Amino acid sequence: FPIVFSINSAYSRREKALEHYSVFKGSALSIRYAHMHWIDENSKENRRGLKINGDEHVNRIDTIYKNLFNNLYEYLHAVKPNPETYDRIIELLGEVSLSNEKIRPFLIDTENSRLQNNLRFMAIGLEKIINIKNYRTPNSLRAYTKVFLNIFPIIFGPFFAHIATDKGMEFGIAIAILYSLVLTILDNIQEDLEDPFDGVGTDDIRLNFPTMLGPSTVED
């Protein structure tokens, strides 16, 4: 059945979305750890003897993350995503980059490289998530599925009539209802999986602010 291919496609997209969202969150957490634990004013790279307020710096990155995930939630949860929200997300990602630059003098070269890699993973994960939101199962396949569901009763009508004549009216009606019910359920499953971010289906991805990025989850 075409609907089976649609379900498989939608399910694969959901699994990919989970993978990319996990990378996005994990990279964000790694950057937060770096801002909390890697800063060393006595680093050999700090040749100018610069100073930094660690608590103020961590509070800033926490505020950026809160705004970033709130805007990401707004974008992904919308039926029609707002391009302005996307622009704000990109700006906030830029603020994360600027925060990384502020601690660059206090990190050794290898740590700076790892920090930039985590930011790159965030950017790549973000774009993959947004592409999954905006580009879904091919329209031709979804349209074919809808056509199949609509013409199914017409095509199989004689079959159900034959069963009703041969086995009894009640049995024929029961088989027709069963077939239609199964296809309707499969179609609903496909619709629920199609957009894993809309919050409609029970299997949708939760987009609330990750508790692992909260200030109370990590101690200095």
Predicted regions and their residues:
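Alpha-helical transmembrane anchor segments
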Residues: 2-8, 131-220
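Juxtamembrane membrane-water interface segments immediately C-terminal to a transmembrane helix
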Residues: 14-25
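Cytosolic juxtamembrane regulatory segments of multi-pass membrane proteins
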Residues: 29-43, 209-220
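Structured inter-helical modules in multipass membrane proteins
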Residues: 31-141
